């Protein structure tokens, strides 16, 4: 399935098609990865051709930013809605039908995550939660990591290394896997672990599509520069997108 490109990145805004693509891949034993595209990795992709190719090499990509969806909807004169990675994550956990593998982040977060998710699906107690050594993306032992995953045989592999590292990691790991769909969903492990300082926005902010603002205040040192880089890149992207839409 080839999605239309928005701001040069393949995105699937149709929730039914997004889920169908993922579930068909799991059913057929296809190896692939899913990227949750928001302002940060979109900005990186439009300033780094290698990373752009990584995003566009995904099985399918969801739009993780409500502001991003609104901007694109305005340009293309159609209602486009974001599909937030945190919601996709909890949906597949609650389905209680897939074997999953949780990879990355810290041992503290993984322990909290396992405890909390096991309350939703008791089978998760028997699933693998593995940290990774801190190193550059090109320095991982991909064959060794893949062997560990292949021996477990999961349907879904959740990867939490932060963007853009996790997307590049999945792209490099893919050739060594026998089956399984990888999801690079960053801080979602933290959201659901109940430990540390990283929390998802409260419900009232989610309803008002203000999760981006919550993240800015929660970790300004990291997120404010990311938003600023997006704002600087946005005029060029809008101009190019409007030209393509008119053409």
Regions found by a protein language model. Name each.
Residues 69-148, 152:
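Conserved beta-alpha
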Residues 149, 153-158, 162-163, 179:
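Proline-aspartate-enriched helix->loop->beta-strand connector
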Residues 132-137, 178-216:
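Short, flexible loop segments at boundaries between secondary-structure elements
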Residues 31, 98, 177-181:
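A short helix->loop->beta-strand "cap" motif at the edges of active sites that frequently abuts
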Residues 39-42, 161-166, 188:
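Short glycine-rich anion-binding loops that position phosphate/pyrophosphate groups of nucleotides
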Residues 1-81, 86-87:
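N-terminal nucleotide/polyanion-binding subdomain common to many enzyme families
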């Amino acid at each position: 399935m080839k999605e239309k490109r928005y701001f040069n990145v393949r995105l699937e805004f149709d929730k039914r098609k997004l889920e169908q693509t993922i579930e068909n891949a799991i059913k057929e034993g296809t190896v692939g990865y899913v990227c949750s595209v928001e302002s940060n990795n979109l900005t990186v992709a439009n300033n780094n051709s290698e990373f752009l190719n990584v995003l566009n090499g995904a099985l399918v990509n969801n739009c993780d930013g409500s502001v991003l969806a609104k901007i694109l909807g305005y340009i293309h004169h159609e209602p486009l809605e974001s599909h937030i990675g945190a919601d996709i994550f909890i949906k597949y956990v609650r389905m209680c039908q897939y074997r999953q593998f949780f990879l990355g982040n810290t041992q503290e977060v993984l322990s909290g995550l396992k405890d909390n998710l096991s309350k939703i699906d008791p089978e998760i107690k028997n699933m693998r939660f593995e940290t990774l050594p801190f190193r550059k993306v090109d320095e991982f032992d991909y064959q060794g990591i893949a062997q560990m995953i292949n021996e477990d045989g999961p349907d879904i592999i959740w990867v939490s290394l932060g963007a853009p590292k996790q997307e590049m990691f999945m792209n490099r790991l893919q050739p060594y896997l026998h089956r399984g769909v990888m999801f690079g969903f960053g801080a979602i492990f933290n959201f659901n672990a109940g430990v540390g300082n990283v929390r998802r926005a409260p419900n009232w902010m989610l309803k008002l599509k203000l999760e981006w603002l919550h993240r800015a205040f929660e970790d300004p040192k990291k997120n404010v520069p990311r938003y600023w880089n997006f704002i600087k890149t946005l005029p060029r992207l809008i101009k190019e997108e409007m030209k393509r839409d008119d053409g």
